[in-house]
């Protein structure tokens, strides 16, 4: 069994239980910040990632939604190296808002991995904003339906040290698939899909928002199957990796996919420091909640915010008190 991030902190489940249900009734008016008088311009900075990934356009959409909803708030974008940089920048007071993936947020709060010896104890969540889901694709000609049937085959798990490869190894470990009984290659989506087409690979793993465009193109080019997990496998994965949550790849997400596929994912979180004014966080949370639908039209990944309880449930670290009060 490979070593997982969270063996020492099983009590993290209380974080996702801190809010037993998200707000579903009509919204109350946002409560003003006590530390920011009405009419005073507030300039905030949101940390994203490089412009080629998902975080940058997502951050841009969030910044625009907040700035347009409240003329007294301006949100500026800050490109960064991604989740780790954003967590550290929040801790150091260099940014006000930051996009941080759930696994990194948990590691930061608890001083694990890159944060060993330097935890970000004050990291808190306003809302989950989009998911990345585990997707496995294989040629239908193999005649397999489940991930565990990949044992003994040639598998592209994702680039070295990527979240795609990390999640793939967690999955394969649960399924009893190792480098001694199978061929695991650190190919990404592009080279992995090419390997499927050429016959040099049997399956590819993707860990991203769905649909993954490369998988859609591959399923257009040849009959493919989106592989499933058994309930036992999902239970094992989720019980040992508390930053993951259960989700579904809906039927017809990919060409030829005629049924829902149960899977797991990780949420990208909009984070702040514990010390951010509670009234301001309440207002920001309200803006995001009220604009969830329009945010999805700005970037498809953000449609998840419109799903019941997505924004405030199954979180790996605590909500900020202002966000918790809103929900």
Predicted regions: what they are:
Residues 1-42:
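Short, low-complexity disordered leader/linker segments with a strong preference
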Residues 31, 36-107:
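N-terminal (or domain-start) structured segment
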Residues 41, 70-72, 82-85, 92, ...:
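Extracytoplasmic
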Residues 41-69, 73-74, 132-198, 313, ...:
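Bilobed "Venus flytrap"/periplasmic-binding protein-like clamshell domains
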Residues 49, 61, 65-72, 89, ...:
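Structured segments of extracytoplasmic/periplasmic soluble domains
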Residues 102-104, 112-114, 142, 178-271, ...:
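Pocket-lining segment of extracytoplasmic ligand-binding domains
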Residues 116-129, 134, 253-262:
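A structural signal for short loop-to-beta-strand junctions that line the ligand-binding cleft
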Residues 261-326:
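Segments of small-molecule ligand-sensing domains
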């Amino acid at each position: 069994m490979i070593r997982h991030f969270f063996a020492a902190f099983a009590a993290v489940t209380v974080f996702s239980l801190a809010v037993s249900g998200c707000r579903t009734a009509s919204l109350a008016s946002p409560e003003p910040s006590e530390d920011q008088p009405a009419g005073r311009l507030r300039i905030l900075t949101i940390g994203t990632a490089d412009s080629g990934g998902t975080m940058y356009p997502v951050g841009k959409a969030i910044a625009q939604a907040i700035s347009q909803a409240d003329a007294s708030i301006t949100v500026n974008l800050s490109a960064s190296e991604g989740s780790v940089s954003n967590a550290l920048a929040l801790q150091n007071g260099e940014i006000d808002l930051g996009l941080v993936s759930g696994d990194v947020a948990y590691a930061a709060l608890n001083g694990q991995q890159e944060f060993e010896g330097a935890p970000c104890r004050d990291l808190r969540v306003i809302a989950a904003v989009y998911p990345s889901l585990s997707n496995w694709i294989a040629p239908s000609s193999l005649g397999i339906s489940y991930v565990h049937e990949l044992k003994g085959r040639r598998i592209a798990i994702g680039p070295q040290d990527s979240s795609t490869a990390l999640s793939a190894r967690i999955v394969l470990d649960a399924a009893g698939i190792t480098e001694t009984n199978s061929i695991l290659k650190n190919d990404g989506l592009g080279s992995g899909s090419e390997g499927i087409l050429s016959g040099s690979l049997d399956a590819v793993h993707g860990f991203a928002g769905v649909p993954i465009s490369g998988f859609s193109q591959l399923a257009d080019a040849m009959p493919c199957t989106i592989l499933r997990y058994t309930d036992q496998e999902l239970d094992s994965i989720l019980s040992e990796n508390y930053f993951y949550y259960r989700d579904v790849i809906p039927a017809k997400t990919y060409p030829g996919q005629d049924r829902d596929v149960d899977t797991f994912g990780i949420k990208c979180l909009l984070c702040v420091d514990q010390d951010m004014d509670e009234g301001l966080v309440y207002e920001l949370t309200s803006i995001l909640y009220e604009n969830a639908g329009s945010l999805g039209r700005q970037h498809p990944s953000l449609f998840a915010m419109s799903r019941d309880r997505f924004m405030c449930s199954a979180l790996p670290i605590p909500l900020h008190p202002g966000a918790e009060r809103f929900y």
